[in-house]
Design a protein with these regions (language model features):
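Short linear sequence motif anchored by a di-proline
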Residues: 1-218
Length: 218
């Protein structure tokens, strides 16, 4: 069975953006992001890196009714170049970074889903690879994005999430040394960046317990 990896995450806290050596955006945003919410992203424009607020769930330029847009918050790397919703952004090299504190995923224990947060062991925020799009729907300008995902069936840490019978998927983390390159990459070069998370750099904990030891994020 095919499943999406990330439908809920905690974006980077504004008071921690300096940890990425970035300037703070001028807009506000929610501390817990779900599909169709607006969230911050980074993209390159005229050689500069800029912040934008974007809808979590990509809206293709051909969309006439926003109600048509469903399940576009994750883009599978295996099909991103051919899927109607994503192929324009991919072929036009519209790559972005989504700075986050935590990714939330279900872990099944005794047949029941328990939500866990995946975060860096050193407590630092990190940046997720995405594609972005610009569309005008019924006269409204919409900037949107999707997180790229890869298969992680054999990843010893990430394969514990989602239902046992489901394919295991993961977002892609772009490390600090490759962030600028990712924002200027071509779609032919992009697959070289889409690799699994380093096993020893991430851990997980139940979502309902995380505020006990990660209260510094939001």
């Amino acid at each position: 069975m095919v499943t999406d990896m990330c439908a809920n995450y905690e974006p980077i806290a504004k008071n921690r953006i300096h940890l990425l050596d970035l300037f703070e955006p001028t807009f506000d945003y929610k501390a817990d992001i779900f599909p169709n919410y607006s969230s911050p992203l980074l993209f390159a424009k005229a050689g500069n890196i800029e912040w934008r607020l974007a809808r979590f769930g990509l809206v293709a330029p051909w969309v006439k009714d926003i109600k048509q847009v469903k399940n576009t918050y994750n883009a599978r790397i295996e099909t991103v170049a051919s899927k109607p919703s994503f192929k324009n952004a991919w072929k036009k090299n519209q790559f972005c970074l989504i700075p986050v504190e935590t990714i939330f995923e279900p872990k099944y224990i005794d047949g029941k889903a328990h939500w866990y947060g995946i975060y860096r062991t050193d407590g630092m925020p990190f940046t997720v690879a995405g594609i972005y799009e610009y569309a005008v729907v019924n006269g409204e300008e919409i900037r949107s994005m999707s997180m790229l995902t890869i298969n992680v069936d054999t990843h010893p840490f990430l394969n514990q999430f989602h239902a046992p019978e489901d394919e295991k998927r993961s977002v892609v983390v772009i490390p600090p040394s490759r962030r600028n390159a990712w924002l200027h990459v071509t779609h032919d070069e992009a697959p070289d960046f889409l690799v699994e998370m380093p096993i020893d750099e991430y851990t997980a904990a139940p979502k309902n317990e995380m505020n006990k030891f990660r209260s510094n994020t939001h």
